[in-house]
């Protein structure tokens, strides 16, 4: 089924509001296995709206109109669609009762004539009741094309779509099931190159790569009648792609860190720390507390984190962490020595199981003859201290600092998995 979204409202065309409804509806249609091919915005003008509806009806099976259901004269979506379809407008009793209750609550004796427009419905439509507003929506199929009218305010549109529209549409369509795989340590272009043949010849399931700051996700999607069938297809595709090797001969499964739309390296690390019963601390220089801030975003962070340090200057590294100033000056702030000492001292001072040290050059200028983007990350446990050097080139200060924390979380994650013989 091909769908088209039509946003009605001059305020969209003038930039007064952002059309967030289009994104929401596109996501919902995708979940239902309905392909959105076109999105259009049109002002509050009957002639132009008639033209847009006519074009949509010739190329789409499902036409969804949003906005223009209110009580004013420029709210003309239902009236215009009724005119196009040659249908009358009728009064919906349930919506009318809601109007009466609304005005009674406001101590007004009767609804006003213009407000009655909000309870009107195109003759022959299925009513889509409005749980959070007054304007009733509707669904009608004419000559093989299904038309849907929805209110414009997102607070009204979203509940109507979820509770009224989706159940009607889902009864006749296979749903779209998706699985999101999250990778760290590989760029989007490298990942796409590794998966070139799979992506080039894909049909169903499909593979869609997305780049985020410092990481890449793959969305695997399939249309299926039920979850079990979808899982079978997605499992097969995942097994196939994770066995593929990158240009430097790494299997992709070693770069996979988790699943899910809202997952992150910080969350994965946090959950591993909780599961293992281990605690962590950090001493941060260039990241200035960003690592600790991400860790404490999660409820229950106190189970794994007691406290940490922000030691931005060389003097504070010596004073707060007890690292000899002469050694810091000899090795340099931007060095593996300093990162390891920061991690080890922070761990000892807080009696934590794991210590992280972050030091480097956020930029844009170099420091100690080290180019911008140079980062050293130390990791200390009771039995071992190690460090990692990464160069995050061509990035802003903000990106360098954030990506540095991703490398730190990944170090901790891998160390925890190794301790459980899972890596």
Swiss-Prot record:
Pfam families: CinA, CinA_KH, MoCF_biosynth. It comes from the Bacteria. InterPro entries: CinA (IPR050101), CinA-like_C (IPR036653), CinA_C (IPR008136), CinA_KH (IPR041424), Competence-induced_CinA (IPR008135), MoaB/Mog-like_dom_sf (IPR036425), MoaB/Mog_dom (IPR001453). Signal peptide: none annotated. NCBIfam families: cinA_nterm (TIGR00200), molyb_syn (TIGR00177), PncC_domain (TIGR00199), PRK00549.1 (NF001813). Belongs to the CinA family. This is Putative competence-damage inducible protein. It comes from Streptococcus equi subsp. zooepidemicus (strain H70). The lineage of its organism: Bacteria, Bacillati, Bacillota, Bacilli, Lactobacillales.
